[in-house]
């Protein structure tokens, strides 16, 4: 049964094949015979979905409707059913529309319009066969219709005008330019084949260019292009299709060719010869102009001339340059001519171009010299230096004072007219940067006028340069010469040999010597200096390495000391100025190379090869032995003892207990201000002289001041940090105040009991002092007297507070008189001039018209009463503190504030007499009065302000404290002077600068009569008032 199944399948396949073969799509194409003018139909069957042949071709630009139908399609299915034929594609349902149509019943395809091949060279028509239901009975077929070309387009050039350039004298067939034209007709067809041709050439004449007919390349016809004849050519070129046939279409273009210049013309001078004249010793920037002629293009290097002096310029006197604007050569005189050497000069001038000549003519060029005659005019000449530069050198070893007046040599000028040394000439030094030279004005001998440093900045590369001027006395002409002085350099690091003394054995007399590590310029060379003569025959030195050498005796030595002079040179052949002495001690040695002589400690040798210690031999290294002498052992023991003793001494100093009280138990360092000690006064002028201090006021020195302010009042403390006290007391306190006095223990006397220590301040000295008791009886007597004096002064002052008339104001003056000036009367008293210092005594005698007797050197002693009653309820509280020097602490320096005072302030001081039997104590301060301060003094005792002498009574000579107080009497309208700034501004010494405040300060407070005992004046005191002191107030200060 299986074979039956396969049989049926095979039959079915055969049936399908038969049906496929019988269904075909037939196309009939009408072909035209153009030559015979006949047409015929050709049937084309589609086999396996492929067309056999194209449809009939159509000619562009013609009416092809007479050829319709151009094709016919037919399907073999039309015998069984009704078929509709349809077409689509370009020219049907795509632009251009409506070119082709089809008969849907018969399948004939017709063309209906004119076609353009340049627009559509080929039409693709898709054909379909449809049944009544619109279904394709056949697969769509493609029908191709080709458009035949006709010559309807002329050639077109890419440019209407072509420009090109070509160098002149170019070889033949050199490409100039390539023309390009295109044709829109069918490619590779006769209608698009273009032929090129040169129609015309301007300028006319022999044709210079050739054109390739097919490529359009324009080339040179020959090598005779000459820019100097024609610099531009204009060609008219035609391009024709159909290979240039007469029936072809054509077009034309212009071709402009520029001929480029090359250096093919030789320059020549306008004249055949030239001449000029010039005075000798003169220069000229334009002696003569030479014109060159060149036919090449102007402004280019082919035209620009280059002038050359071929001969005659042996002394380099002339130079020639080209003017680029005119192409002329300018002959210049750059070096002075000498009539005596060359009265006439014959030059030869040649010319060529800046650019190289063209290869076509380069071999033909020859430079032809043109003669130029120069005549030198003789003139009267001055001196001149020959040679213009002369070298001198300083001999080795000349330095320091030996340079002074050292003669370098002689440099003289000559007379150019005669050639002999110049006469009537003065020599002077011109440029001399260091002012080191001097010259003899007549002989020209040059010397050093001063010493100089050989490392000066004026010495460059070891040469010092200066100029010498020679001036002719007659004509005034000047000649300049240059001298170059070679100054030998100082070798700061000249090679030095280690200076130690060396020991050598007599049986092996050799020792190693080395250069120290600070020397530079290795390797070094060593040699023995034969001084004294014959020593070089006894010793030989030979280098072992870059820094060492071995010194060997040539003969047997005797025990003793030897000094051998050795000269060491570095790699630059520089050496020390003097030979170095190598000290040797020769002795007999044992087997260990130890010196048997007890005077030598041992032998110090060094291994030549391994840098070790050992016997010095040339072949091997030995063992070094170093001995230590008794002196060395003693120094070692002494050092150990000092190391042990130093901590013990330090421990004793640190553990010593401090004595609580008493001057005798304190450590008092010896003062440095005693005799024999130099003091630095830090002042200008001569040093102070040693004179009697009893009648000489010590000079004022700068001192340190500091203004301290608390929250309630302003205090001014004046510290006499620069003062010096001499006498029997050990402390002096300066107290200035009004109601309250604040002071400082300022100085200490050198003769007081107890110890004192000197301390240095900014300027001068400041001493600490020991505390001691104050003589209260003396204080009572002192202040009682001052109180009486102030009371008498107030009672005796007349009341002059009334209208006063002054003559110098004139009559009817609108300005009123000044009242309330009764206190000025005392200032007008001329008796104050009798108490002026000796330096003002002469002025006072002139004013008083009398002779003033000097004050006696001693004052009368005033007995001190110990039981004087107190006058009035005055209470004085003295607070003092004394500290040991170990407690001294210093504060940082503080800037002193300027005093400011408001209004007019009256200050009055009363001084009491002191015991004349005691030498006055001199205190040196440096007061500085505030601006706008008027100070007048009515002195009751010879105490001139606190700069002067303070006389201390004899019974107080051994006391530690002496109080010096100033007091102001209060009156209505007078502001409270407890303000310490006022005190500083108008009375008392004002110290400028800063002070180091230490523990030696003591404060003295003076109480008001209304205050109870023990109450101090402070911020809560009813007698204390606060004032701001202005700097522009007028302050009148009176002392009594």
UniProtKB/Swiss-Prot annotation:
Primary localization: membrane
One GO biological process term: cell-cell adhesion
Residues glycosylated per entry: 110, 545
Effect of residue 267 to R: In HYPT6; uncertain significance; may affect calcium binding
Residue spans, topological domain Cytoplasmic: 653-1040
Membrane side Extracellular: residue ranges: 50-631
Propeptide feature: residues: 24-49
Transmembrane segment boundaries: 632-652
Pfam families associated with the record: CADH_Y-type_LIR, Cadherin
Membrane topology: Single-pass type I membrane protein
Domain notes: Three calcium ions are usually bound at the interface of each cadherin domain and rigidify the connections, imparting a strong curvature to the full-length ectodomain.
Biological function: A component of desmosome cell-cell junctions which are required for positive regulation of cellular adhesion. Coordinates the transition from proliferation to differentiation in hair follicle keratinocytes. Plays a role in moderating lymphocyte migration to inflamed skin and maintaining homeostasis of the epidermal inflammatory response.
Designated name of the protein: Desmoglein-4
Originating organism: Homo sapiens
